[in-house]
A protein has these predicted regions:
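Short Gly/Thr/Asp-enriched flexible loops that form oxyanion-binding sites at enzyme active sites
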Residues: 97-121, 140
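Glycine-rich phosphate-binding loop plus the immediately following alpha-helix
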Residues: 143, 166-210, 241-251, 255
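N-terminal beta-alpha supersecondary unit
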Residues: 18-91, 97-101, 130, 134
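A contiguous, well-structured pocket-lining segment that forms one wall/lid of small-molecule binding clefts
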Residues: 204-275
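Conserved phosphate-binding catalytic cores of ATP/NTP-utilizing and phosphoryl-transfer enzymes
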Residues: 16-17, 128-150
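Short beta-strand scaffold segments in enzyme catalytic cores
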Residues: 30-36, 151-153, 159-163
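Phosphate/ATP-binding catalytic cores across multiple sugar-kinase/actin-like superfamilies
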Residues: 76-84, 267-276
Length: 276
């Protein structure tokens, strides 16, 4: 589980600057970057990303296709990241790689490549939990984004609310009981006949929608809940998705679906964001 990640080294000990090549292949994007840091601060030296557009025709990620695409892309993407950082390959001090969670086959491609590269260079290999990577990325944007803080992690497959007293220590406050927020966006996009990945398309359509035409229930926001209840911070989006399905079917039966799509998109987006 996310809460069982191993603690990271103390941040207050002085360290020499090191360069780490990071590799990510947990889903449908192959990416690599070089990060340079001294334990107190870090700088993103490069970032190379290759998205897999092939999944659009299927309306979602096909694991086998994702794994094969990673096999083709991972070496060129890593080389590009090193070149963009303006360093030689032997200047890499460590290799970090996403090792969970994600699509098993996709993860295996990244981990196998990272293991081979680390062994070739004779440098340490560091496994990184995908969700912990999201947390640490905030410091690359804002050096002041250091614990203690409360974190809301919203990604394609996860929606988590965490208490972060220090790096490496995480307490789960709440999580989705079913669909993640990103997953709900993709599924609703499909119901509305929009391309994959659906988030940006739902957002664009919702921008022209009437917020009062379709007001969907805000899941898990019950008046009877009190702080301290086990489910106080939990989320649920499957019911919201079902509400959208019924709204689409009703509009189709009335023959007004084309006119109502933006209103349905707006109602869904408002409900999900209000819930978060």
């Amino acid at each position: 589980s996310f809460g069982s990640c191993s603690p990271n080294p103390r941040r207050d000990a002085p360290l020499l600057a090191v360069r780490v090549l990071g590799i990510e292949s947990s889903c449908d994007e192959t990416s690599a970057s070089v990060v340079e840091g001294d334990g107190a601060s870090a700088t993103l030296r490069s970032l190379a990303i290759l998205s897999q557009d092939v999944h659009a025709i299927f309306g979602g990620v096909v694991p086998e296709i994702a794994s094969r695409a990673h096999l083709t892309a991972i070496a060129p993407v890593a080389r590009q990241a090193i070149a963009d950082a303006g360093i030689a390959q032997d200047a890499i001090d460590a290799v970090a790689v996403t090792n969970a969670p994600g699509l098993v086959g996709a993860l295996l491609v990244g981990v196998a490549f990272a293991k081979g590269l680390a062994a070739t260079l004779g440098v340490p290999l560091i496994g990184v939990h995908h969700m912990e990577g999201h947390l640490f990325a905030t410091e690359l944007e804002d050096a002041a984004a250091a614990p203690p803080f409360t974190a809301l992690l919203v990604s394609g497959g996860h929606t988590l609310l965490l208490d972060v007293p220090e790096w490496g220590t995480y307490r789960m406050l709440g999580a989705t009981r079913d669909d993640a927020a990103g997953e709900a966006f993709d599924k609703v996009a499909k119901l509305l006949g929009l391309p994959y990945p659906g988030g940006r398309h739902v957002e664009a359509m919702a921008a022209t929608g009437n917020p009062r035409r379709h007001r969907f229930a805000r899941p898990m926001l019950n008046a009877g809940q009190r702080p301290g209840d086990d489910d106080y911070y939990d989320l649920s989006f499957s019911g919201l998705k079902t509400g959208v399905l019924h709204a689409v079917r009703d509009a189709e039966a009335r023959g007004t679906i084309d006119a109502e799509r933006p209103d349905i998109a707006r109602g869904f987006q408002d409900a999900l964001i209000d819930t978060l």
